[in-house]
A protein has these predicted regions:
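Short, Lys/Arg-enriched charge-dense amphipathic segments
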Residues: 93-107, 185-193, 230-240
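Intrinsically disordered, low-complexity regions enriched in acidic/Ser/Thr/Pro/Gln residues
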Residues: 1-173, 177-178, 182-184
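Short beta-strand-to-turn element immediately C-terminal to the catalytic PLP-Schiff-base lysine
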Residues: 176-177, 270-272
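Surface-exposed beta-strand edges and their flanking turn/coil or helix-capping segments
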Residues: 58-63, 73, 108-111, 136-137, ...
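Glycine- and Gly-Pro-enriched alpha-helical subdomains that act as flexible
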Residues: 163-215
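Feature captures the catalytic cores and cofactor-binding loops of soluble hydro-lyases/lyases
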Residues: 192-269, 275-278
Length: 279
């Protein structure tokens, strides 16, 4: 599932407005209904960011892989809860009813699934847990970063990735200033962890200057990465991969400049192009 956005495509210092397909990212709250001591209990078990579609397969696989069930016969039914919501008119809550009562590990159901290295919000157990703790928009007057620095950012990031050079299997985030100087870089198998490490280090050591710096990330930019950047008042976030729909919508809402598909030959601007100096 995807949605089209108007995007400023930058190449050779020229801007072209094009329609760009962006993968939809939406939260799915998963609930479990089961019988305990003769009573029907309902438990929120997790929330995950997903591309809508095949949600029944998703909860089946989740229950099996977490060994909440041993086989698919233990699932009596799966149903969507509530009315379709949001911009895409989607069901974002799904509930599985199981007939398993013996040896059901309730503690496993209640634990926070924070170990998923690709999605930090997957540990949340309610849609109410996903919110942006920010009220005001970013100052649109800064930072101002030249096109040439943005184009160099993937190589600047790669040059600082010592672990990636060894393993090829790790993400990174870098804080880069307006002159193209890499202030700091942090790596992790989880892209959200890499950004947390970077912001933790730079804020703790007084290295963050939001008026003259931006953040470059490996991989795609999703909702959570943009959310983390917003909490640190980062004006520009650039990724070598594609953003998701929630990332674009969130960036637009708070006036962040969001860049995707950044490479030496060009990049896409998904929101607030005014911070980028072309030419």
């Amino acid at each position: 599932m995807d949605i089209k956005y108007n995007v400023s495509k930058i190449k050779d210092s020229k801007e072209e407005i094009v329609k760009d397909a962006v993968s939809v990212e939406e939260p799915l709250e998963m609930r479990l209904k089961y019988k305990k001591n003769g009573k029907i209990e309902t438990q929120n078990i997790s929330i995950t960011m997903r591309t809508p579609g095949n949600d029944e397969d998703l909860i089946r696989g989740f229950l099996f892989n977490e060994r909440i069930i041993e086989n698919m016969d233990e699932i009596d039914s799966i149903q969507n809860i509530g009315d379709p919501v949001g911009d895409y008119n989607l069901h974002n809550v799904i509930e599985a009813t199981i007939n398993k009562t013996d040896n059901l590990d309730i503690g496993k159901l209640k634990r926070n699934f924070v170990t998923n290295s690709s999605c930090g919000v997957c540990g949340k157990t309610s849609l109410d847990s996903i919110e942006v703790l920010k009220n005001d928009k970013l100052d649109s007057h800064f930072p101002k970063i030249k096109e040439e620095i943005i184009l160099k950012s993937p190589s600047l990031l790669m040059n600082e990735q010592s672990e990636f050079a060894k393993t090829g299997g790790i993400h990174a985030s870098a804080l880069i200033d307006e002159a193209g100087l890499v202030i700091a870089t942090r790596e992790d198998v989880g892209r959200h962890n890499a950004l947390d490490k970077l912001l933790g280090h730079t804020i703790q050591n007084g290295l963050l200057n939001i008026k003259a710096q931006f953040i470059a990330c490996s991989g795609r930019l999703n909702f959570e990465l943009v959310q983390k950047g917003l909490m640190a008042n980062i004006g520009i976030m650039a990724g070598v991969g594609a953003p998701t729909s929630l990332a674009v919508d969130l960036a637009k809402r708070f006036d962040m400049t969001l860049l995707g598909f950044v490479k030496e030959s060009g990049f896409n601007i998904y929101s607030n192009k005014d911070r980028i100096i072309l030419g």
